[in-house]
Every structure is written in structure tokens, then in C-alpha cells.
């Protein structure tokens, strides 16, 4: 029998270690591709369906079942400017535009409850495989409920509202769990890429790069969906048939999430991996699957624990307060502008979809160029970049306010809406990419789902307030233009808050909290 020398054994070990490293890097790159599919499959829902189709459908259903503002015995038609919808056996009447805003506000409320509950369970079984299964489960439910929207009659406005709430709640879970994977993949890639370990800034660069690409891919898929939707609507029996577009969005979401089932996998555990590494990487050994109802409260207890240690998370608190205001106003700008264009400027459904397409194209441009070129060229840190994007976005409601002063400018004509869509798209894409990357840098490792659920509370949960206030303003004035005052004030208010944000200090805060156990 021949025994190898000590040198041969060492070489064999080195080859084995190198092979394991290459396999892990390969798996990480595959996971990143799978993460792109999460954005590619689900983004058309929030960008196309929630932002365009469903608000129009809600207003359309409300108008079909509504009456005129002046005389509640007269059925509302497309020729009437001001219509109201009777709810709860006509006990109360609301503006037909407000029905869409109130429904969205309620949907975000339920979305917030579901997201916090589910994210805690995800953090307990903190593996890529488990998170993938959660993504697929809620993605399938959300996609099917979106498809069902296309099958209801225009008299079923309560059912439409219910399906909107269900699908939006499912998307919230998909969004939070999907975003929580980003810092795991970045840490894992840099952990096994020796050429990058000497540069601390590579975490920031890689996070921003992947986040920007994900946002661009998501908006690109939404753009494709919008273009195909125009063709489908033109081929349908009615040019106002928006339900065929929601059908296509649901099918798109259902099909394109399937590649995640084989792309998102746990990486193999190397023999030299330390427990500290396992806390940061997506290579956790799965816990034994024993579900307890007590696990459902883990997200809430984790949330309260995180808030309890807010003194260690000064910059996270600053970010969330600022983002609560910005997300509320920017999200509400879209639904307000769509309803404004339809009710005040009388734009057709196809024209409104074109507006959405222009928004998507420029959102892709903003998500791609702002993090990768503008940020690098001018050496702008993420917190400063956010301030400039907010200033850019604030011009939209300001221009709408000018309509009270001037007769011919200030969103008085249809062509102005197309210019506004371009302007809005750039700000939307930039905010989407930069906000996720900045937040992922200042949260503790191993608690991504919980903290991204907090991010979702501010990102989506703030949308409870915005549409509610706009709905109340519209119900009181029956003129949605007045809502631009509120939107402009909110954006300006956020600027001094983000001026206080310090990302480098936030990283140290996150490292401190990472050492404090979160209660189960």
C-alpha cells in the first residue's frame, strides 16, 4: 500500500478548499440570479397593477355603481364630473376617486399586519431555502388573487376591494422576504472572494450595484407587461377593459417566480466556516421543522425588541422616520396623478397606460444611472443622494399647485402629464435603488427579515396615511388637485430629516445591536 507524503496531503486539502470556495461562489451567483427573478416576477404587480390598473378599476367600478353628487337618485355616467358611491346600504357616500384611495389604505394596513407576523417566522428558520418557500407560497396566492380580479363583474366592487387587499398583502410578504436576502448574498459573496476582502467599501458598492440591477430588472419587466397590456386591451371588446391587463399581470407573476424554486438554494457548509460566519451568510443549517403558533409572535417580539434598542439604532430611526414621509408622499403621488388624469383631464385608459410606460422607462433609467454613474462620478454618499432625489420629486406636486395660480400651466393639459411621468419615473427608480441599498447597510446581520419588515411598515405602512388623507381631502373638496399641497409639504419635510443620517455611524450601531440577542 502506498502512503502519500505530507506535501501531497496538504495539496489535496488546498484543492478541496479551493473547490468548496468555487462551489460556494457559484451558488452565490446563482442565488443572486434567483433574486433577480423575484424582482422580475413580482414588480409588475406593484408597478403596473397596484399603481395603474387596480386604482382605475376601483374608480371605474365605483362610478358604475355610483350616483351624481347633486342628486343621489341619478345614476352616474361617464359624462358626469362629480360622482359618489354609496357604501353600507347607502349609509355613507364617498367620492368615486376616494374609493380607490380608501381601499388601498385598508390593504396596506392588513399588509403590515401580515408582513410583521410572517417575517418573524422567516427569521427563526433563517435559510435561503425557507425564504424561497415563503416567497413562492405568498407569490402564488398573490398571483391567483390578481387573476381572479379579471373574472369578477363590475357590480362586485366589494369583491374587487377584497381581492386588492389580499393580493397586496401577499406582495408585501414577498417584498420583505425578497429584500432580506440581499445582504445575505452580498456578505456571502465577499466572504469567499479574497480579492475583495481588503476593501471595506466593496460591501457598499456591491449592495448598491445588485440593488440597482434588481430595480432595473423589475421595472423592465413592468415595462414589458405594460406594452403587452396595451395590445391586449386594444384587442379586447372594450378599450376600457382593464381587467384583461390584470389577468396578464397575474399570469406573469405566477409563471416567472417558478425559476426561484431551483435557483435559490442554501450554500454548502465548508469545514472551516465559523459560527460567526454562519450568522452572516446564507448557509445556516436548517432547524428541525416543528411549527408552533407561538412562532407567529416572534416577528412582533423582534420588532418591539428592535424598537426597545432604538438608542443603539439612531441612524435606523432617522432613516425610517424620513422614509415614512417620503414613501408616503411618493407612493401617493402616483395614485393621485392617475386618478387626477382620469377624472380631471379625462384621459383614456390607453393614454394612462402610456403614462405608466413612460414612468417605467425613466424609472429603469433612474435606477440604473443614479447608483452606478451619478453616485460614483460625484462621489455622493447614499444619504446625500436621497436628499437630491427627494428635491427632484418635490417639483411634481409643486407644479400641480401652480394650476391654482395660472390658467395654462400646472397640469392643465394632457401633454403635461406625459412630461410629469418622465420626471416622476426618474425619481421613483432612483429612490427604489438607493433606499434599499442604504437601509441594508445599517441593519444587523441575521435579523434582515425583521428589520426589512420595519422598512416595509414605513415603506408600505406609511401608505395607510397618505391615501386616507387624500381621500378625505377629495371627499371634502371634490377636487383632487388640492391633494398636491399635502404631497409637496411632506416631501419638503423629509429633507432636513435625511440631512441627519450618517451611514458609517449606522453601520457601527448595527454591529452593536447584532451582539444583543433578539427574544424569540
UniProtKB/Swiss-Prot annotation:
GO cellular component: fungal-type vacuole membrane
Recorded topology in the membrane: Multi-pass membrane protein
Alphabetized UniProt keyword annotations: Amino-acid transport, Autophagy, Glycoprotein, Membrane, Transmembrane, Transmembrane helix, Transport, Vacuole
Disulfide bonds: none
Entries under InterPro entries matching the protein: Atg22, Atg22-like, ATG22/LtaA_families, MFS_trans_sf
Glycosites: 11, 193, 280
Pfam families assigned: ATG22
Function text: Vacuolar effluxer which mediate the efflux of amino acids resulting from autophagic degradation. The release of autophagic amino acids allows the maintenance of protein synthesis and viability during nitrogen starvation.
Family the UniProt entry places it in: Belongs to the ATG22 family.
Protein's UniProt name: Autophagy-related protein 22
Organism: Vanderwaltozyma polyspora (strain ATCC 22028 / DSM 70294 / BCRC 21397 / CBS 2163 / NBRC 10782 / NRRL Y-8283 / UCD 57-17) (Kluyveromyces polysporus)
Amino acid at each position: 500500500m502506498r502512503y502519500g507524503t505530507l506535501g501531497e496531503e496538504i495539496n489535496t486539502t488546498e484543492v478541496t478548499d479551493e473547490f468548496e470556495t468555487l462551489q460556494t461562489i457559484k451558488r452565490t451567483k446563482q442565488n443572486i440570479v434567483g433574486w433577480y427573478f423575484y424582482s422580475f416576477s413580482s414588480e409588475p404587480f406593484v408597478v403596473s397593477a397596484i399603481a395603474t390598473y387596480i386604482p382605475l378599476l376601483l374608480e371605474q367600478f365605483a362610478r358604475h355603481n355610483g350616483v351624481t353628487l347633486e342628486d343621489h337618485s341619478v345614476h352616474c355616467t361617464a359624462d358626469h364630473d362629480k360622482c359618489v358611491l354609496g357604501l353600507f346600504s347607502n349609509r355613507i357616500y364617498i367620492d368615486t376617486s376616494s374609493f380607490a384611495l380608501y381601499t388601498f389604505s385598508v390593504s396596506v394596513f392588513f399588509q403590515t399586519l401580515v408582513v410583521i407576523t410572517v417575517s418573524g417566522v422567516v427569521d427563526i428558520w433563517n435559510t435561503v431555502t425557507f425564504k424561497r418557500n415563503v416567497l413562492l407560497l405568498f407569490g402564488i396566492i398573490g398571483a391567483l388573487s390578481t387573476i381572479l380580479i379579471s373574472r369578477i363583474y363590475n357590480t362586485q366592487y366589494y369583491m374587487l376591494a377584497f381581492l386588492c387587499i389580499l393580493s397586496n398583502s401577499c406582495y408585501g410578504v414577498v417584498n420583505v422576504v425578497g429584500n432580506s436576502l440581499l445582504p445575505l448574498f452580498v456578505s456571502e459573496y465577499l466572504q469567499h472572494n479574497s480579492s475583495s476582502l481588503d476593501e471595506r467599501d466593496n460591501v457598499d458598492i456591491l449592495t448598491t450595484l445588485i440593488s440597482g440591477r434588481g430595480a432595473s430588472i423589475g421595472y423592465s419587466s413592468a415595462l414589458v407587461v405594460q406594452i403587452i397590456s396595451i395590445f391586449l386591451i386594444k384587442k379586447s371588446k372594450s378599450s376600457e377593459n382593464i381587467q384583461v391587463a390584470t389577468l396578464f399581470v397575474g399570469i406573469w407573476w405566477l409563471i416567472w417566480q417558478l425559476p426561484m424554486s431551483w435557483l435559490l438554494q442554501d450554500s454548502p457548509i465548508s469545514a472551516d466556516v465559523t459560527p460567526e460566519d454562519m450568522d452572516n451568510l446564507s448557509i445556516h443549517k436548517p432547524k428541525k421543522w416543528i411549527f408552533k403558533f407561538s412562532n407567529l409572535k416572534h416577528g412582533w417580539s423582534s420588532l418591539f425588541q428592535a424598537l426597545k434598542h432604538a438608542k443603539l439604532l439612531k441612524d435606523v430611526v432617522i432613516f425610517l422616520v424620513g422614509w415614512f414621509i417620503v414613501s408616503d408622499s411618493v407612493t401617493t403621488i402616483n395614485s393621485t396623478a392617475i386618478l387626477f388624469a382620469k377624472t380631471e383631464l379625462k384621459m383614456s385608459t390607453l393614454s394612462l397606460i402610456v403614462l405608466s410606460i413612460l414612468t417605467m422607462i425613466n424609472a429603469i433609467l433612474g435606477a440604473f444611472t443614479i447608483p452606478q454613474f451619478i453616485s460614483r462620478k460625484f462621489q455622493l454618499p447614499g444619504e446625500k443622494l436621497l436628499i437630491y432625489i427627494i428635491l427632484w420629486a418635490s417639483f411634481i406636486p409643486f407644479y400641480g399647485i401652480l394650476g391654482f395660480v395660472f390658467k395654462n400651466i400646472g397640469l392643465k393639459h394632457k401633454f403635461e402629464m406625459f412630461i410629469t411621468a418622465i420626471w416622476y419615473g426618474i425619481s421613483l427608480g432612483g429612490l427604489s435603488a438607493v433606499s434599499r441599498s442604504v437601509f441594508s447597510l445599517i441593519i444587523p446581520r441575521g435579523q434582515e427579515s425583521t428589520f426589512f419588515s420595519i422598512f416595509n411598515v414605513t415603506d408600505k405602512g406609511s401608505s395607510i396615511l397618505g391615501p386616507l388623507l387624500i381621500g378625505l381631502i377629495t371627499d371634502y373638496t371634490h377636487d383632487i388637485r388640492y391633494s398636491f399641497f399635502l404631497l409637496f409639504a411632506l416631501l419638503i419635510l423629509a429633507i432636513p430629516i435625511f440631512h441627519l443620517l450618517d451611514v458609517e455611524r449606522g453601520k457601527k450601531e448595527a454591529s452593536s445591536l447584532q451582539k444583543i440577542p433578539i427574544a424569540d
